[in-house]
């Protein structure tokens, strides 16, 4: 279901891992990187740091390395008023199931 939503472009996909994790392994193709510690600032429309990719009427799919941080992120988003929130779970599971990945840029490029 997540792959279909992502392919259709209906959902925003959010990687809540820390920057070094994303730099090392890449991220789900088309995902927005917002570390778990910054999520409230980026997802709250009243925040001066709001990321305009977040819309409360748009489905949000969150993931992390193992599924723990993304579960917490999902709860946070629901507390902020997002109604369609999905936990994709672990990034490694996405990769192992053939999901698309945007690879990191080589250092120095």
What are these regions (language model features)?
Residues 1-11, 20-59, 68-109:
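Rhodanese-like catalytic fold shared by cysteine-dependent sulfurtransferases
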Residues 13-15:
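Structural scaffold elements adjacent to functional motifs in cytosolic proteins
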Residues 63:
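Short, surface-exposed ligand- or partner-binding patches at beta-edge/loop junctions that are enriched
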